[in-house]
């Protein structure tokens, strides 16, 4: 579970760091699923990048959110910084890029 520190816009996200570099995320701030890649950096660091496509009610692409992040794992916790940009269907910026810090905690596997 990841919590970005965005003033006035708190939200939570769930991210999966899969074997082979697969990265998936979904959050309470946007519809859709972010899909990308992640890579280890040194003994406890990581980077990830993902895109999240948004479609209008007509089924046409309306915007693309791109996130690039780096951080550190510390046991079952993580911290880092991420930059987010949002572009329209032609690639032109819809809003200025935003950089935020984030923290997160591993979701533990539990028996029923």
Annotate each predicted stretch with a short phrase:
Residues 12-14, 35-37, 66-70, 97-103:
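Well-ordered beta-strand positions in beta-sheet-rich domains
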Residues 84-112:
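Edge beta-strand at a domain terminus
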């Amino acid at each position: 579970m990841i919590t970005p520190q965005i003033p006035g816009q708190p939200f939570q996200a769930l991210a999966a760091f899969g074997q082979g570099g697969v990265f998936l995320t979904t959050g309470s701030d946007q519809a859709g699923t972010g899909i990308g890649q992640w890579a280890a950096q040194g003994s406890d660091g990581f980077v990830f990048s993902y895109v999240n496509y948004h479609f209008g009610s007509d089924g046409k692409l309306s915007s693309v959110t791109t996130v690039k992040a780096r951080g550190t794992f510390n046991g079952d916790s993580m911290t880092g910084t991420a930059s987010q940009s949002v572009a329209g269907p032609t690639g032109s910026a819809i809003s200025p890029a935003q950089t935020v810090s984030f923290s997160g905690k591993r979701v533990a596997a539990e028996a029923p």
